[in-house]
Amino acid sequence: MKIAAYEVRRDEQKDFAFIAEKLGVELTEAEDNLTLENIDTVNGAEGVTTLGRTRLDRALLTAVQERGVKYISTRTIGADHIDLTAAKELGLKVCNSNYAPNGVADYTVMLILLSLRKYKPALWRAQVNDYSLAGLQGRELRNLTVGIPALDHQSGKV
């Protein structure tokens, strides 16, 4: 089986090589997004994997399907960059990554608290020995209403 990987980061390359060898898969890698302009790079591949920058709309999905691709994998939690209706109509199988819900929830809460407490500007100041408090008055989470806009297993942990 041949898989074409796009948006490949340097930190992924070693793992890709290990898995490809272990499974006996031919793997082509590209740092670029998959586009209609470079669509011929999927020729001969049964599967395509991307991150979230590639917009797999109906036109791009049709083009990969016409070149023999049967499987689309996104290395992201969400799949909102993929036209899932078009993929289903074209007979393409789609999957996405599964991240530990608790880790994602912890990261989300951390970002919320960092934003509320204006941590980034405080950190910048501390790096130049400026410990003044002007403009750093944050807010407390207990005084705010927090909405969780999704209903998946990730957001349920937040």
Positions of PLM-derived features:
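Glycine-rich adenosine-cofactor-binding loop
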Residues: 7, 139-158
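Phosphate-binding beta-alpha-beta segment of Rossmann-like dinucleotide-binding domains, i.e.
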Residues: 90, 95-145
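Short secondary-structure transition/capping segments
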Residues: 14, 73-86, 120-130, 144-150
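An N-terminal-biased, well-structured beta-alpha scaffold segment characteristic
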Residues: 2-93
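A structural signal for well-ordered alpha-helical scaffolds and beta->alpha junctions
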Residues: 9-13, 101, 105, 155
